[in-house]
Amino acid sequence: LAYINTTSELKTECDVCDTSSSAVQICSRLDNDKILFIPDPNLGRYVAEQMPEKTFAFYKGGCPRHIVVSAKDVEKARKAHPNALLLVHPECRQEVVEQADYVGSTTGMPRNLTAENLLSERKTVL
């Protein structure tokens, strides 16, 4: 299974492509119990946590924008904005995802903020 941002050349070798918003749904529909998830291990781990019945293998890669965000960055942001919601993309490191108020794709973030009533008490979003 290859992430949509994978090179065209690599996609030709894969059985399925996904996006961050469709990864869980697509993986849940695969008959295979073993999935090679490329190239982003952070997104792959996020998907795997939601499907313990499947076995995942990951490629050592990552989105250059998301892998630079650290737990220390989260700590600084929370200190500067203590009442803000922290939204993160599933391609962020696990240490960041674990501290988030919401994890989702860039498409899903604005859509789900109101749907899940996340803004009821806090008005600021990081």
Feature map (PLM): residue ranges:
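The feature marks the mature, well-folded catalytic cores of soluble enzymes
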Residues: 1-126
